[in-house]
Amino acid sequence: MSWGYLEDASGIKGHADRICVPKNESELVAELAEASGQQAPVTVAGGGSGLTGGRVPFGGWLISMEKFRRLDLDSGKARVGAGITLHELHAAAKIGGQFYPPDPTETMAFMGGTIACNSSGSRSFMYGATRRWIERLRVALPSGEILDVHRGDAIDFDVPEIPQPAARKHSCGYPLRPGMDWIDLFTGAEGTLGIVLEAEVRLLPTPRELLNGIIFFPSDEVALDALDAWRSVTGLRMLEYVDDPALRMIAQRYPDVPETAKAALIIEQIMEGDRDIDAWVDRLAETGAFEEKSWFGTSDADRERFRKFRHALPETALDISVRNGFTSLGTDFSVPIEKNREMLAFYRKHMDRIMPGHYCIFGHVGDGHPHVNMLPATQAEFDAGSDVLTVFARQCVQLGASVAAEHGLGKRKAKFLPIQYSTVHIEPMKAVKR
C-alpha cells in the first residue's frame, strides 16, 4: 500500500504549505535554513507506514526523505540512507549471509522512520529494539547543522535522569539518563531533535537453520500457559500471540486455520539439530496444543508463508477499519511480562462493553506487548474506542508499562505523554529540545 505525502497508514490526513523532496544533504540543509528563517514548522516524512500520524503535516513544510538511498554492506554492518526500506536492507543482507535483527512487521517502512520510532517487531523477543543495533548516525539539526555521531560519543551537556517504566519495550519521550550517548538520544525521538540522514547498523550472520511454527490451541488460557512455559526455550527468537477473533478475521485468507482453534502462538527458533523438532513435539503434548493441526517448517518458503500470515493480521484489521470508514484505532502499550494476563483481561473487559465482537488482539505477548486492534462499525463505537485508549494508558502506567512501545506517539498519541511522565519529568525533555 502507498500513501501520499499528506497521510499515513493511520488514515489521518493533513495539509502542508510546501512539500520538499531534497535529493541530497545540501538541498536539505538549505530547505531547513529557509524554513527556520520563515519560522515555518517542519514535518519529516518517511515511508508513510506509521500508525500515529507522525509524518502527517498540519501546516508548515513537509520534507520527504525518499531520495536518501545509500545502501552499502560490509561484514557485520550496513550503511543505510533514511529512505532505504526495511525490505531492501533485509534482502541485501541476505545475499551476503547476514541479517538485520530488528524486524518491524511493515517491511516497506523507511529505515529513517524505524530509527525515529525505535521500532522493534516480532524478533525483539531475542534481539530487542532498533536502538541496540545502531553504531553511527548522521543527523541534520533544525538549524541545518550536521552531526555525525558514533556509539559511545558522550553528550556535551548535563543529562538528568528520568524514571523509565519496567516494561521491556519503551519508545515514549526521551529516555534521559546520565551517561547516555547521542545515539541513545536521537533514536526514538521521532524526528523532534533532528532528521536522521543515514545510519550505520550492525548485522549478524544468518543462522544455519531456523524452525518456524504456528501452533494452535483449544483455548486462550492454554495458549497463555504455553507462552509462560516456552519463554525460556533456548534459541527462541519469536513468541507471538493471536487470539480467536484475529484467527476468525483472517480465516477467509487462510482457510486451513483449524475451526476449533481459539488461539495461536507464532514461534521461530534457531535450530541446533533434529532434537529441537522432537522437543517441540513433546512441548505440544505437554501443553495441550493441537499436535496434528499446528504448522511447522524449516525452509525459506515456509518462513515466508508464516511471515505473510503474521503480516496479514494488521493488514486485514486496517482494511476493515478503512472499509468501515474509520482510521486505524489500536494500542501500542507494553507491560511487564508478569502483568500480561492482567492487562489482557482489562482490555477485554472494556472492549466487550464498548465494541463487542468488533476487536481482536495479537502481537508481541512474549514481550508483554499485545496490540488491541479495534474494528468499529459505527461512529459511536469509534468515539468510545478513542476514549477508552486513555483508560488503557492510565492502567498500563499503573502496572509499570509504556504507553508507546514501538510506534511512537506521533500526533495521535501525544496526549499520552503526560500520562507516562509528570510535568517535573517532561520539563527536562523540553529543555533538551530547546
Show the residue positions of the predicted features.
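A glycine- and small-aliphatic-rich helix-loop capping segment at beta-alpha/alpha-beta transitions
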Residues: 54-69, 94-98, 120-131, 201-205, ...
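N-terminal accessory segments
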Residues: 1-15, 37-42, 47, 284-306, ...
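N-terminal flexible segment immediately upstream of the FAD-binding catalytic core
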Residues: 1-39, 44-77, 127, 200-203, ...
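C-terminal substrate-recognition/cap domain of FAD-linked oxidoreductases
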Residues: 2, 187-189, 195, 201-391, ...
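Glycine-rich tight-turn/loop motif centered on a GG-T
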Residues: 17-21, 77, 330-332, 375-386, ...
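FAD-binding subdomain of flavoenzyme oxidoreductases
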Residues: 70-74, 82, 86-87, 91-235
